[in-house]
Amino acid sequence: MIDAPFIEIEDLHFSRGDHEIFRGINMTIPRGKVTAIMGPSGTGKTTLLKLIGGQLTPERGRIVIDGQDVHRLSRKALFTLRKRMGMLFQSGALFSDLDVFENVAFPLRVHTDLPDTMVRDLVLLKLQAVGLRGAR
């Protein structure tokens, strides 16, 4: 049995004024995989992520995440769905008033009930894994 994709984009159309950004885009993103949206500046990467996250509304087409049509969800249901997603945009990804350790710890503190000692251990483990051991 083949698993259903986590994200399905069907016949997506989106423009800003007279500038057509997407025309009939179809795409599937598998469950449990890290997926990168890459391309030169101005090709619509951030716009696509905002459409997927429900921050923008397409002119036509559907974006379905885990069986839910993003643009037909209530505000509350959309916020619930967003809690299960992670998006990293090309800028503004770090809190400039927090050090490296606290930037890594932040989502663990906000989205889990882990004790501080476990958050500390996980952050140190992750920093070491990417060669930032001792970073503050």
Regions found by a protein language model. Name each.
Residues M38-P40:
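The feature captures the beta-strand-to-loop junction immediately N-terminal to the Walker
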